[in-house]
Design a protein with these regions (language model features):
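Extended, low-polarity transmembrane helix blocks
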Residues: 2-78, 87-106, 113-199
Length: 199
């Protein structure tokens, strides 16, 4: 008798839960990627653009001739080895620095406007991984426990394992869900392809 009452109560609770949250999931699911893009814009867009600006060289050709600081940020140990003489580095180093600088401008912009969002978010995941490894092993952050941090501890603000885990969560959400309703991806998919957005 009592088990039946307990089962009935659980059934009513499950029904109430589904009645409340199923419509929310059904109608507001597209809000998740939109919120992810908003949070990215509010917290990370200017961070990446400010970082990219420090990498530009002088004048209009600065987009092709990065600053010395750009090389020092991306290849710190190699720059130390050549006593910060950029002319001693190879074309490979130049190509990586230029590509990284452009990526810091272009990929965040694509995410914010919702254009090729999945590809841009995937590119940013790769960028953040390389950035984090450079911070740890190039700039010596691995030697400082507070920089690396740790999961499941009481300190929530380490640069790598805590902060960038949240960055990754936003980016992975966009890779999985796409840009959401208010995006260029949605406009392109409906007007040009006549299909739901997949970019």
């Amino acid at each position: 008798m009592f088990p039946n009452r307990k089962t009935a109560a659980m059934d009513r609770l499950a029904f109430l839960h589904d009645s409340l949250f199923s419509p929310i999931e059904r109608h507001l699911d597209g809000l998740v990627p939109l919120l992810a893009r908003f949070v990215f814009a509010a917290t990370l867009l200017m961070y990446f653009w400010s970082s990219a600006l420090t990498k530009l060289g002088d004048g209009i050709m600065g987009i092709f001739v990065p600053s010395t600081g750009a090389y020092a940020q991306i290849f710190p140990k190699q720059m130390e080895a050549v006593v910060y003489d950029v002319s001693q580095l190879s074309i490979f180093h130049w190509a990586v620095v230029v590509a990284g600088t452009w990526a810091e401008f272009i990929l965040p912009l694509l995410i914010v406007i919702g254009l090729f969002t999945r590809l841009a978010a995937l590119g940013m995941i790769g960028f953040v991984v390389v950035q984090s490894l450079t911070d740890l092993y190039g700039h010596g952050g691995i030697a400082h426990a507070e920089t690396l941090g740790a999961w499941f501890d009481k300190v929530p603000d380490s640069v790598i394992l805590d902060q960038r885990a949240f960055w990754m969560l936003i980016l992975v959400t966009l890779v999985i869900k796409g840009a959401g309703a208010l995006s260029f991806d949605r406009i392109l998919s409906r007007q040009i392809l006549g299909a739901p957005a997949t970019a």
